[in-house]
A protein has these predicted regions:
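Long, histidine/aromatic-enriched segments associated with O2/redox biology
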Residues: 1-300
């Protein structure tokens, strides 16, 4: 087997407009939906300047390509329930399309074309649009992704290794977090910094950060390294963060969620007092070659 190529949109930084479409299968058409999503791409990696990243519920991918599925990878099939009843809901869907581009009109038109192409096989269960805020900050006003690996490092961290099932693919955790803006903005900047564990202007990690700070709760040296493509979403009155995290296996992502929920320490991430997860799904994002194989081998 020659080396497998990741879907290019995973690492396409700098795009200013994003859409996330999560699909439920219509009736018995799971494999047809998967084939149709894979065929949206064909060999081209961009459509009209749009990056298109396709992922699938792990169990659905395994049904289509059993030899090309990471062992034991499962969807987000059960809520993560932490201390004091705090819950991260499981809202696993069958397929996801993440579109990104330089302007929302082309993202919109491409998303509409994709939905039309999948009509009768999959219905849109969740649709969210995102856009950058103050370059690389989320709607808390803090820099998001300070610990991200560089683009040189990221593939080696988040791609399934060569010569193992799923090579060149990656595991995506997609979660929508809605912010309690009034409560957050009721804090002073110094109080916010204690919640996050970093300085607000320049994102320097605090020496004496609390153990419940977001930085301490999601320490990648402890849980494993991931690559995040988080983006703000929403309106002035209803907004938050799309968590878009990639890893070579599910465990680092899952361990961070469990830590944030307080399952490790008994105390949950202080940030979860101000932001609430409303969705959660794991998707396998296959290599370009794997998508081509599925789109061609299952076609008549």
């Amino acid at each position: 087997l020659s080396a497998r190529s990741p879907q290019t949109g995973i690492f396409a930084l700098g795009t200013s407009s994003h859409a996330y479409l999560e699909f439920d299968v219509v009736g018995p058409h799971g494999l047809e939906l998967l084939e149709a999503v894979a065929s949206l791409r064909e060999p081209r990696t961009t459509m009209g300047g749009i990056n298109l990243v396709a992922g699938f519920r792990p169990e659905l991918w395994r049904a289509a390509a059993p030899d090309d599925a990471p062992a034991a990878l499962e969807g987000f099939n059960a809520d993560v329930t932490g201390v004091d009843g705090f819950t991260m809901p499981a809202t696993q869907r069958d397929a996801v399309l993440w579109l990104s581009g330089g302007a929302y009109d082309v993202v919109f038109d491409t998303a509409r074309a994709a939905i039309t192409a999948l009509a009768g096989l999959g219905t849109v269960a969740e649709e969210t649009s995102s856009w950058p805020y103050l370059h690389d900050r989320d709607l808390t006003g803090f820099v998001d992704g300070s610990e991200n690996p560089t683009l040189v490092e990221a593939p080696g961290i988040v791609l399934v290794p060569e010569e193992t099932p799923g090579a060149g693919g990656t595991v995506l955790l997609l979660q929508k977090w809605t912010h309690d803006a009034a409560a957050w903005e009721g804090l002073t900047a110094a109080e916010q910094e204690q919640v996050i564990g970093r300085t607000k202007p320049d994102s320097v990690e605090l020496e004496d950060k609390p153990g419940t700070s977001h930085v301490a709760s999601t320490d990648q040296d402890q849980f494993g390294h991931i690559f995040r493509r988080n983006m703000p979403y929403g309106t002035v009155t209803d907004h938050g963060t799309m968590f878009v995290g990639f890893a070579s296996e599910r465990r680092p992502l899952e361990a961070m969620l469990e830590s944030m929920a307080g399952l490790a320490s008994g105390e949950r991430d202080a940030l979860t007092n101000y932001t609430t997860p409303v969705s959660g799904a794991y998707y396998f994002v296959p290599s370009i070659e794997s998508l081509l194989e599925v789109s061609s081998t299952t076609s008549p």
